[in-house]
Amino acid sequence: MKYIIFDFDGTIGDSQSLIVKTLQDTMRARKLEVKSDEECAKTIGLRLDEAFVSLFDMSDEEGMECAATYREIFLDNKKTMIVQPFPHVIETLRALHHQGYVLGMASSRNHCSLDGYVKQMQLEDIFSSIVAGDDVEHVKPAPDMVFKALGEMRGMKNPVTSPDDVKDMLEETLVVGDMNFDVDMAHHAGCRACSVTYGNGTREQLAAAEWIIDDFAELQKILKG
């Protein structure tokens, strides 16, 4: 492996409580039925508007309106609910970068939010590509984020979402995430997946991944083969 693309929520950052609370606060603000913690957690990894559409029988336009409300509430909630990295994440990422792996990030978050957390964790110097939900037309489980990330890793000024420009990189690419959306994105792109069990997905949901780990530090063992 040479290229590694990481999810953020539930993989690098422990954000479940913040996301679930903000989803539920948004439901209250929009006079919607408040879904359970478990129901909300299952949508983590989807783009916000898609999360609301999946939870409620609503139109795409209504989903966008809910997403806008969510972002307003999120700005207040994040002041008191700090997202911390999971154990062994920071030191492992820095070790991989030092060892010569090319690292990228693919998250359904919008770029403003994602960049803020990357800077908070002081990780901006180790990622060659950061792809957010508002950077592509089709988010997870579509493969667009993988193709765009690899294009940026290659130094393309205007990375395309076609596999043709990066097909020689796919066999050397690993996607690391905590949800079935991440596994599906990897496989749709033509690369392999490693799932973490400490995030938002269950081991059963992640069974299709080539590797499953319980601790982020175990990634080093997988890469050493």
Where in this protein do the model-derived segments appear?
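Asp-based, Mg2+/Mn2+-dependent phosphohydrolase catalytic module
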Residues: 1-2, 97, 111, 116-225
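Short phosphate-binding/catalytic loops that engage adenosine nucleotides
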Residues: 32, 101, 191
